[in-house]
Amino acid sequence: MALRKTHPLLKIANDALVDLPAPSNISAWWNFGSLLGLCLATQILTGLFLAMHYTSDIATAFSSVTHICRDVNYGWLIRNMHANGASFFFICIYMHIARGLYYGSYLYKETWNVGVILLLLVMMTAFVGYVLPWGQMSFWGATVITNLLSAVPYVGNALVQWIWGGFSVDNATLTRFFAFHFLFPFVIAAVTVIHLLFLHETGSNNPAGINSDADKISFHPYFSYKDLLGFIIMMVALTSLALFSPNLLGDPDNFTPANPLVTPPHIKPEWYFLFAYAILRSIPNKLGGVLALLASILVLMLVPFLHTSKQRGLTFRPLTQILFWTFVANVIILTWIGGMPVEHPFIIIGQVASFLYFLLLLVLSPLAGWVENKALSWA
């Protein structure tokens, strides 16, 4: 028998990457899981090389990033790949979640819930990472977002000062954020293994949403090569962005060193957090906004329990398809609103879009599933 099937270590890899039975009809939407693995590996690698030259001290952090870009061999490339790699990470994660929502993959509850935890970890990692260059938006973003914890009743202020390590965002804050930013990707890698462990208990879902045991093919060579094609497409796109317009998705304010005495005119996070930021801002109450922000992500954990349809995916459900694409459009609108100033008409658009975000997920989708069941029973 082949060594890969008998060796204690190799057989784990073999069962996950070589002899894994996979549905023969899974589309390119099933590529994003492996792409996220590639993103994580790329981010850890580029991040490691950046950490070799970065200093987590408020006096030198900004200069050390400048030094990386100017003086370190290919430092500019490593930094641009890392910064834009984060954007690609989130593009892939949102596509991966959208695929899960569309095809009913969330019915694998353990896999789905571990996935939501992974999303929270990635968001947390990206947030602390954005603070590290110690530019204006780094500093003020850290100040604004950590300040939200002061909305927690009774312990809020103590909590904020505990996280800051003082009475404001200062050196202690930057140092601990660097420590967290270095640590979390390895935690993410560990949780990813758990995510895969649960997935391999059930096997992959497929676009038809039906049992595929009768028609399985081996992961290698079919999907290993399919994943490789995905890798090539993504890496070409990432390197193109990093080489041709590395600052396209960044904020110009972050080219100015952090200054606690000057507040930027518009404080906003990176594009991938704007939808949640818009939901946060749409509620004119601090605690309410914080709860809505949390709910915007945690609502995903409720999705499996709100599945009413007799069918798994949306492939043959035109009514819910309309709701799904409305939801996608709505998230895009929220992303746009999150980057806009708090003034008319953006305030009301943001409030309507935020309301619609929760309405679509919690009320309309389960309702549509029920209606479709009724329609099927009449047919």
From Swiss-Prot:
Residues that hold heme b b562 according to the record: H82, H181
Family: Belongs to the cytochrome b family.
Name under which the protein is recorded: Cytochrome b
Entry keyword set: Electron transport, Heme, Iron, Membrane, Metal-binding, Mitochondrion, Mitochondrion inner membrane, Respiratory chain, Transmembrane, Transmembrane helix, Transport, Ubiquinone
PANTHER family: CYTOCHROME B
Cofactor(s) needed for function: heme b
InterPro entries registered for this protein in UniProt: Cyt_b/b6_C (IPR005798), Cyt_b/b6_C_sf (IPR036150), Cyt_b/b6_N (IPR005797), Cytb/b6-like_sf (IPR027387), Cytochrome_b (IPR030689), Cytochrome_b_C_euk/bac (IPR048260), Cytochrome_b_N_euk/bac (IPR048259), Di-haem_cyt_TM (IPR016174)
Binding site for a ubiquinone: H200
GO molecular function, one term: ubiquinol-cytochrome-c reductase activity
Membrane topology note: Multi-pass membrane protein
Transmembrane segments: 32-52, 76-97, 112-132, 177-197, 225-245, 287-307, 319-339, 346-366
Gene label: mt-cyb
Source species: Chlorophthalmus agassizi
Cystines in this chain: none
Any GO BP: mitochondrial electron transport, ubiquinol to cytochrome c
GO CC entries: mitochondrial inner membrane; respiratory chain complex III
Gene3D superfamilies: Cytochrome Bc1 Complex, Chain C
Subunit structure: The cytochrome bc1 complex contains 3 respiratory subunits (MT-CYB, CYC1 and UQCRFS1), 2 core proteins (UQCRC1 and UQCRC2) and probably 6 low-molecular weight proteins.
Pfam family, one: Cytochrom_B_C
Function of the protein: Component of the ubiquinol-cytochrome c reductase complex (complex III or cytochrome b-c1 complex) that is part of the mitochondrial respiratory chain. The b-c1 complex mediates electron transfer from ubiquinol to cytochrome c. Contributes to the generation of a proton gradient across the mitochondrial membrane that is then used for ATP synthesis.
